[in-house]
Amino acid sequence: MVILGPPAVGKMTVGRAICATSDFRLFHNHHVIEPLREVFDFGTPPFQTLCHEFRRRVMEEAAATGTRLVFTVTLRVDVADHVAALASWVEPFSSAGLPVSFVQLSADLDVRLLRNRTEGRLEAKPSKRDLAWSDANVREWAQYRTNTDPDLPSAADDLVAAYPCLSLDNSSLTAEEAAARILAWL
C-alpha cells in the first residue's frame, strides 16, 4: 500500500495505525531521509541516488518475502521523474503478482500546519524540528499537486489508475479512524 499526500497530512501516523491493527509493516519516507541526511546534504545527487536505490531495494526484498508494506511518500504527481520513481518502487510487488493499492490523503492547510508540530512527527523526523523551516515547507508544498484529481490530468494518472485507489480527506479524522476506513476499503 502506498500512501500519498502533502507534507504533514498524516501519512506516517495513519500508516502506524494501519500497522497496529493489521499485518502490514510501515516503511515511511523518513526511514530513508533521516539517515542519509547524516552523510549527504538533502537533495544532492548522492542523496537522491541512494534514497531512490534504498527504497527500491526495500521494496524488492519485501516483495520477495511477501511482506506487506505501507509505504508513505510525498511527491509531485505532475512531475514525470517523481512518477517514474514511484512506478519503480511498486514494480517489484506488481511483477510478483502481489496486491498494490494507493491511498491519497488530503487535509486542509491549517490542519497540516498543526500536525506538523506533533510530538510523534518531530520524534520520527529530526529534519522537521526547525519549525520555522518546516512550516514554510508545508506552506510551499501547498502549491504542488501531491494527489491525482480526475478533473486535472497528471503524469501519475495511468500509474494510479492501474491499481485500487482511495482518496480520503482526513482533516477531521483521527489516525485510527482513517486507518479503519482504509482497512475496511481494502
Explain the meaning of each model-derived region.
Residues 6:
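P-loop (Walker A) phosphate-binding loop of NTP-binding proteins
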Residues 118-176:
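Small-molecule kinase domains that catalyze NTP-dependent phosphoryl transfer to phosphate-bearing small molecules
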Residues 109-116:
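Switch/connector loops and helix/strand junctions flanking conserved nucleotide-binding motifs
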Residues 13-63:
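Conserved substrate/cofactor phosphate-moiety recognition/catalytic segment
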Residues 1-2:
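Short hydrophobic/aromatic beta-strand immediately N-terminal to the Walker A/P-loop
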Residues 10:
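Conserved glycine(s) of the Walker
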Residues 55, 59, 175-183:
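Short, amphipathic alpha-helical "lid/cap" segments that border enzyme active or binding sites
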Residues 50-109:
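Glycine-rich phosphate-binding loop used to anchor ATP phosphates in small-molecule kinases
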